[in-house]
Amino acid sequence: MQLHIAHATINLQLPSSALEQIDVTNILSSGSVASAFDLTPPARGKYWAGQGGHYICTQPALLGLPARHVIFSSTEAKDLAFGPSVDVPGARSQLDGRRNTDALLSASRDHAAAKWASEYQADGHSDFHLPSRMDLLMAYVCAPSLFETSSWYWSSTQLSRNCAFVQDF
């Protein structure tokens, strides 16, 4: 059984006979399941064991998005094209990388960067996406040493049909 609760994935390995005896609704409503916000993050830029990557910062709730921990994968894809030259109005959010990535994938199956990010898995987490423009800015401010200084990093925030916002370090 796998539960996804407020940006935290919980994996339970139980025999199938035990599943019939568990009232998951009661467990969740009792508050006994810890969310990612009950965990203490490591120092900025350090690998967060069990969370799938390096902790960057905690973003407050902003413009309709919930508060969330920003975690970057420990693996980078090199030399991926951003995607085809297609205007994707749903990929213009400065803050919501998940929404942008989903929009890019919906608009084109040939979007190599969005496809790579959405298929990435680590520490049992499979909810990765391309970073938004704000996510990359926070990485620049909070953990620049994690990134190559000779490279530009694509965001999921599309600027035009031919370009997205990028960040250098």
List PLM regions with ranges.
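C-terminal, surface-exposed recognition/capping segments
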Residues: M1-I10, D110, H125-D127, R133-F169
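Short, compositionally biased
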Residues: M1-G124
